Amino acid sequence: MFQILEAAKVINHTEDEISFEKILVIGLGQLGLPVAKYVKEKGFDVYGYDNNERALDNAEKQYGIKKIDNFSDIDVFIVCISTHREDDISSPQIDGLMAITRKIAKEATNGKLVSIESTVPRGTTRKMFEILEHRFHVVHAPHRWYALEENVHGVNQLRVIGGVCDCCLRTGIRFYDGVEHAEEKENLGYYRGNKSYKSLGIPMYSVSTVELAELSKIVENADRYLQIAFAEDLYMFCKANGISFTELRDAVNTKWNVNILEPRDGIGGHCIPKDTRMFLESSEIKSKILISAQEVDKDYRKYIERMIKDVNQINH
């Protein structure tokens, strides 16, 4: 309750206070570049910030997104920074996120909107709010962008959003979902903003706390981890017992509420292993089923390595 009251006091929020004109996308990689492109297509004045000069040059060359170094004139900050270690993409790291938060706190104008789209451990957004000294509207709107199906699972799809306080949440929903949608949200019907404000037109599902929004993303990927690990475990079971995994999977998947996945070369990528570790590290009570799933994936990787080695020996 203290943070809600303090935010309302320091931000000095009024319902019609912020105009969303000048948008800065921080991080122009696999996630940030499509976000910047989408925001620009919606008619906003979009700029980019990235430590990688090649990423900045690429954004300007492809979409005309200009780079900017000073944050003083920005209305909305959309943060799309990677939250994994450079030398180990399965390990979470938020040092870059904290550094950019300090830059916003130092240079930006009070009362602006800061939206974290990066996947973060539980409690991170509120830590950022503290670094920002309660002077900004801060929300977490985790991305659901999927590169292989961008047309279906791109920037504009149903998303979860949470704010560090009610006024932050209202402002975030107005930017993403639009005033008309905001008025339809439970407990947000009293909001009446200026309908001339543009929005991204992205449907948002609001939750009661920013921590719930943070958890929603990492739980999504932890659930995916479990599904893949089960497929890996079942594959090894079938091989050990002379059963066709494909035939069994196809038969089981005829049931309407079952969808066993196809195991491949282990659980990898930038998101699923890292986010599963975020979930495991989010509580002193560890998820036994996820820990077991990690062991299954390790066993499966070793199993695949042995299979490849055996095939190579036969071919030679």
Annotate each PLM feature.
Residues 1-316:
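Structural/interface elements that position substrates and couple domains in central-metabolism enzymes
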